[in-house]
Amino acid sequence: ASNGEAPDALGAMYNHLERRGNIWGLTSDVRQKFVASAGLETFDASRHEYLMWLGCAGSYDGDFQKSLRSLFSILRAHGVTFGVLARERCTGDVAKRTGNEYLFQELATANIADFQASAVRKILTAGPPCLKTLGDDYRRLGFDVEVVHSAVFVSRLAPERFSASEKHSDSSSTPEVALHDPCYLSRYAGHADEPRALLTRIGAVLREPERSGRNPFCCGAGGGLLFEEHEEGTRISQRRFEQLQATGVATIVTACPFCAIMLKGAQASANAATEVVDLMTFVDGRIRPASAGAPTAGAQGTSEQAGP
């Protein structure tokens, strides 16, 4: 897109970003309804340690909003204080990855101004692309704050907060899962161990698929491919789903809304019984509330920068 030309699907997405500030072109009332129903407070630096960045998926995707509710439940149970901006616009991740630097700069400049006006110092996000953009690309623009992904944050909660008696609250048997590593979380930010540690601590047994850890196989959404019109042939998402399904598990866990979208699409195409579940949804209910006086996760230095 750097030369002014882009496929129709990307061109439509750019238009959505310019007009509505999100990749799907949805109106802000969709986000506002979710914020209200989830009981989210507007960020106030004097009361909230973290800005919760919802992102396009968290603001507008119904399935991922269910996952965020699980995350909010975990954070509230452990005394983590967080709020959201009254208004969000996309970080510009897809514009950046597909070569539309002008649009990225426009979105980033506006977002940085909002962050600075609200005195934001720590950002918590559940989207690996947002982690990469906020923690790396924005840092290169001079906005250098702590940015942490929710999977990393929750994995570093004090070990005593994980209740052995609740590990298998939904089943009498040990759950076996395959973990799909999001590229921006594992390969670029280097966080392959934390999701695994979290799953292990709640009693899950991991069955590793082909290409995992810090050398994952992409879900097929990265680099703007989420918006590409695919030609005939096997899609990347289908190939990845087959690799995960080959582990023989009934549940595939991931920590990225766009990975979930792609894998669920492949699951539906294959008419497979294997379910795709967000990590926070999987662990919600398996972590007991923090005891009175215990330090919050934020007090343990969970924040990380994304990227090199």
Model-predicted regions and their roles:
Residues 77-87, 117-118, 204-217, 239-251:
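Immediate flanking context of iron-sulfur cluster ligation sites
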Residues 1-18, 106, 110, 146, ...:
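Ferredoxin-type iron-sulfur electron-transfer modules in oxidoreductases and energy-metabolism complexes
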Residues 143-166, 211-214, 268-298, 304-307:
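Short, flexible loop segments at boundaries between secondary-structure elements
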Residues 1-3, 101, 136, 190-191, ...:
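Iron-sulfur (Fe-S) cluster-binding segments and ferredoxin-like electron-carrier domains
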Residues 45-50, 171-177:
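A short, charged/proline- and glycine-enriched loop
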Residues 159-162, 177-229:
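Redox- and metal-dependent alpha/beta enzyme cores, enriched for Fe-S-associated oxidoreductases
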Residues 1-133, 137-142, 157:
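Iron-sulfur-cluster electron-transfer modules
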Residues 55-59, 87-98, 125-133, 181-189, ...:
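Local cysteine-cluster metal-coordination motifs and their immediate loop/turn environment
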